[in-house]
């Protein structure tokens, strides 16, 4: 879920997999489509969708997402490169957790039994994200650290 570099990298590195990438912003979809064409990546389908709305009835072995997870009051939003990004791509309500929780809950209907959900999140959100996974019924929940030793990606497995 999201059409940026992660989806294109997955498709490029795993030509044996079919990747479906979604984004609600038309400009992001158009850019990803141009990049996929420029890079000659054939195993990716890029759709405009508000999370799962265009994916009704489909089931996936794995869902990977880099959703908005920054608190709208975070002072870093006024610094560095993020100043040039659309806020809707960065900011989520409820201390940055609203979209994460939504994806965790909605992914249960979109995963095959035993399928994986992987979510990037803020470096201080690991515990809250793990708890959201567990409360939603996911198993084998774990958080991976980035190169700066910060909790950055949480994954879990959901059984129907």
Residue ranges and their predicted role:
Residues 73, 158-160:
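Short loop segments at secondary-structure junctions
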Residues 1-76:
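Conserved SAM/SAH cofactor-binding pocket of Class I
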Residues 69-99:
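Mobile active-site "lid"/loop adjacent to the S-adenosyl-L-methionine
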Residues 27, 31, 65, 85, ...:
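Residue-level signal for the nucleotide or nucleotide-sugar donor/cofactor binding architecture
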Residues 94-158:
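Conserved Class I SAM-dependent methyltransferase catalytic core
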Residues 14, 41, 85, 135-138:
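Short, well-ordered coil/turn elements that cap or connect secondary structure elements
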């Amino acid at each position: 879920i999201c059409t940026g570099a992660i989806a294109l990298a997955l498709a490029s590195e795993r030509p044996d997999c079919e990747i479906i990438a979604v984004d609600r912003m038309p400009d992001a979809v158009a850019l990803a489509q141009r990049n996929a064409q420029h890079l000659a990546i054939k195993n990716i389908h890029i759709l405009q969708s508000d999370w799962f709305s265009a994916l009704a009835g489909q089931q996936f072995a794995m869902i990977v997402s880099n959703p908005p997870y920054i608190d709208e009051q975070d002072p870093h939003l006024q610094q560095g490169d993020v100043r040039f990004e659309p806020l809707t791509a960065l900011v989520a309500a409820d201390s940055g957790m609203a979209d994460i929780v939504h994806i965790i809950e909605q992914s249960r209907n979109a995963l095959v039994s035993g399928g994986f959900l992987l979510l990037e999140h803020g470096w201080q959100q690991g515990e809250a994200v793990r708890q959201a996974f567990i409360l939603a019924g996911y198993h084998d929940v774990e958080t991976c650290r980035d190169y700066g030793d910060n909790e950055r990606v949480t994954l879990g497995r959901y059984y129907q």
